[in-house]
């Protein structure tokens, strides 16, 4: 029953126009939609985990030429690139390149690596839609 209600609310939320969800706009308030989708960037549908919901947000910085190492996320996550150029690669060689101002719905349960391909640090904010007690990232074992 709980999953059904969560699914209903997700459908309702995703079908509202952005301006319904926005603050009252005027000269001092500007709203810019970043992304709206039902799938991660590899085309897989977004599925929320069962359990007590927990949202986690973090700021990440990746030095020029550095990479995250191969890893995976068991829960949906959403990133916004604030600075630099980030390249995300899957094991099947699909690549997504992101610039400052672009958003990404990350892949779930799929190994991937992020790499700074620019000459300035990549800065991004990342939000996970997880559950209490669940790890957000698992590093690939060598």
Say what each PLM segment does.
Residues 2-9, 13-56, 105, 139-142:
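A short, N-terminal "cap"/entry segment at the start of jelly-roll beta-barrel domains
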Residues 30-34, 50, 68, 88-89, ...:
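Membrane-topology and secretion signals of cell-surface/extracellular proteins
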Residues 43, 60-66, 74, 109-113:
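N-terminal post-signal-peptidase region of extra-cytosolic proteins
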Residues 49-54, 66-78:
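A short beta-loop-beta micro-motif enriched in histidine and acidic residues
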Residues 61, 87, 125-128:
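Soluble periplasmic/extracytoplasmic beta-strand elements of cell-envelope proteins
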Residues 62, 92-109:
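Short acidic-glycine-tyrosine-enriched beta hairpin
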Residues 73-92, 102:
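Glycine- and acidic-residue-biased ligand/ion/polar-headgroup-sensing regions
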Residues 109-134:
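Ligand-binding loop in jelly-roll beta-barrel domains
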């Amino acid at each position: 029953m709980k999953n059904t209600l969560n699914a209903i609310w997700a459908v309702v939320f995703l079908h509202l126009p952005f301006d319904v969800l926005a603050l009252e706009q005027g000269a001092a308030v500007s709203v810019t939609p970043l992304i709206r989708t039902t799938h991660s960037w590899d085309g897989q549908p977004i599925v929320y985990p069962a359990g007590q919901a927990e949202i986690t947000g973090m700021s990440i910085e990746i030095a020029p030429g550095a990479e995250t190492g191969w890893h995976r996320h068991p829960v949906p996550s959403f990133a916004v690139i604030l600075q630099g150029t980030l390249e995300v690669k899957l094991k099947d060689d699909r690549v997504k390149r992101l610039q400052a101002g672009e958003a990404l719905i990350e892949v779930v349960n799929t190994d991937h690596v992020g790499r700074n391909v620019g000459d300035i640090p990549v800065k991004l904010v990342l939000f996970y839609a997880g559950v209490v007690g669940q790890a957000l990232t698992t590093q690939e074992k060598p």
